[in-house]
Amino acid sequence: MQVTETKSEGLKREFQVVLAAAELEDRLTTELAGMKDKVQLKGFRPGKVPVAHLRRVYGRSIMADVVQNAVNEANQKILEENKLKLALEPQIKMPEDKAEIEKALDAKADLAFQVALEVMPTFELQDHSDITVTKPVATVSDEEVETALKRMAEQSRSYADRPEGSAAETGDRVVIDFVGRIGGETFEGGSAEDADLDLGSNTFIPGFEDQLLGAKAGEARTVTVTFPEGYPAEHLAGKEAVFDVTVKAVKAPGEAQIDDELAKTFGLENLDALKDAVRKSLANELDAQSRRRVKKALLDALDARYAFDLPPTLVHQEFAAVWAQVEADLKSRGKTFEDEGTTEEKAQGEYRRIAERRVRLGLVLAQVGETADIKVPDEEVNQALIARLRQFPGQEREVYDFYRKNPQAMAELRAPLFEEKVVDHVLGQVKLVEEPVSKEALFADDEDEAAEAAAPASEAGASKGVISEGVISEGSAPSHETGAA
């Protein structure tokens, strides 16, 4: 087997592989000889079938296997001798001349084919000890605990029927039957019976609740509303609907009590236990946000520190995933790029830079994880799988079977776990400085990003430092199966 490099441009490599006719003949003969004692043919005793006869019967099919094995060996030889890591599966180009292939399959001519590769970049991991990352830290105030308790009490309070003839007010709960029509025709999801609606909660279509203010039990009303342009059900978006509504009951909210009884509705012994649980829950929220801010700052620092060529196809695939999300978001909101103050061309440029950032950070974190021999225990992957199953009540068995039979799906569960471990590892190398901040300051960046996210050209999606699942994977170079994050 003769291997010659014919192209080396950036991360693209091409090689010509030549299998001599004599080598093809030797490989075929070896394979046929190995079959001799295993094949049973009519008219021959076991193990006595002549190799020449086997060649006449099986030669072509065995030669196809010989060629495939040779291609695999050539790929492995190229990677090992040149110390390359693949970004994508090799592209094999066989001769276009069928007569040439026929001769090679008969071992009467050499077989020459091309191998095109897109490889991973090589770069040296740097010393990260000079990186300083600020960790914003906020604490839970007594006022925040009280506010949360009031909200829980309001959500848990009971409702009692108002006196007969009472008109519904903001804050009341009405029990209604309704049938909605668009153009005189009913539509799926537009009807319900005994539905509870808290007036002022803004849980129904804008304008629906307002038209029930003043209604009395037993009263029938016609409510006319228009579905928002960005309504999730696209077939309803922007359309006017008329609802025939029957008010069956008007109920007033009871007093919101913050006491031991409230705690018991949440399965806790007393109010003190509820306060502790609320404080812990709020603290967990602050800790999670602090983690997001720290991770973002770290990834920003790594992104600024590393510069190397990126596999074009990986970037293209990552961009395609991100861009699909952008287009879906615009469509769901009924917006265009012009509505957001940009153009499609400009937005594509910005999101291509986001894709490049994600791929670059994925490669850096993957190499850090490989160098540090970071592993994700199977137990943690199983816990992630259980959490995923809980998202599909009633379908747990089907979802479980899907993951167990789909290695790529399991890899997508493992990837974020691996990423967090790698981030923790790098955080252990940098200088982490805690900075006390208010809750408002801690979440300020999220508010800024939410505002930016409305504009397709913003980097809000990438500024959170999210590496798409599949770009970074445990114990290996990044996969070419990128997903959106």
From Swiss-Prot:
One of its GO terms (biological process) is protein unfolding. It is an enzyme of class 5 (isomerase). One of its GO terms (cellular component) is cytoplasm. Disulfide bonds: none annotated. Its EC number is 5.2.1.8. GO terms for molecular function: peptidyl-prolyl cis-trans isomerase activity; protein folding chaperone; ribosome binding. Residues 452-462 have a biased composition (Low complexity). PROSITE patterns: FKBP_PPIASE. InterPro entries: PPIase_dom_sf, PPIase_FKBP_dom, Trig_fac, Trigger_fac_C, Trigger_fac_C_sf, Trigger_fac_ribosome-bd_bac, Trigger_fac_ribosome-bd_sf, Trigger_fact/SurA_dom_sf. Gene3D superfamilies: 3.10.50.40, Trigger factor ribosome-binding domain, Trigger factor, C-terminal domain. It catalyses: [protein]-peptidylproline (omega=180) = [protein]-peptidylproline (omega=0). Residues 443-485 are annotated as: Disordered. It comes from the Bacteria. It is found in: Cytoplasm. Keywords: Cell cycle, Cell division, Chaperone, Cytoplasm, Isomerase, Rotamase. Involved in protein export. Acts as a chaperone by maintaining the newly synthesized protein in an open conformation. Functions as a peptidyl-prolyl cis-trans isomerase. Belongs to the FKBP-type PPIase family. Tig subfamily. Consists of 3 domains; the N-terminus binds the ribosome, the middle domain has PPIase activity, while the C-terminus has intrinsic chaperone activity on its own. HAMAP family: Trigger_factor_Tig. This is Trigger factor. It comes from Methylobacterium sp. (strain 4-46).
